[in-house]
Amino acid sequence: EARKQLDLKIPYIIMDSDDPLDVARLNTGRKNWSMENYLDQHCARNKMDYRICRNKMQQYGINVAEMVVLLLKQTSLWSRISNDFKTGRFVIPAGGIEHADRIGSQLMQLKKYFYGMESTKNKRFKRSMVVSYIVADKHPKFDHRRFKTACKSKSSWFLTGTSTADYIAIIERIYNAGLTQKNKINLVEFYKTKEYQDK
């Protein structure tokens, strides 16, 4: 309206398209959209799987990329998964919500031990911490109850971590403290060899 009153041209584009994503593509301009921008776009279009994703993010304080990984029962955000998410083809498989709820509730139980594990910007778990826990959960010998008990006296160890590899090593040290050799887990090796991707 202001441009009209000032007798300025109003730029617009007319295009023949039935794809609502064209609006998103045009609005990206020079700056690429984040996963959160795409989530907002698809939620505004009332796509149920995206609305579930947003709800679970808020419920557990987990960022969009990690929640997508959890809902798809994966360990990494592969480019195909990312592209499907951006283009509106994200579909939660059977058991995906239950998987996300299980991991999300375990992280919430551990939250009080994770000093500094929240992003100061949005109060969500740090990405590297969530990814390291997803990897740990894939280890065949990992037991959440054992880890939770071990965290009670060793949670300050988390203060030294900054990356996923750091947190993997810290989880391994905390988990293995006081265990006999046969009950220990080799989480660092499990992570380095990417065995978790096959689980």
Per-range role (PLM):
Residues 2-199:
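Accessory terminal alpha-helical modules
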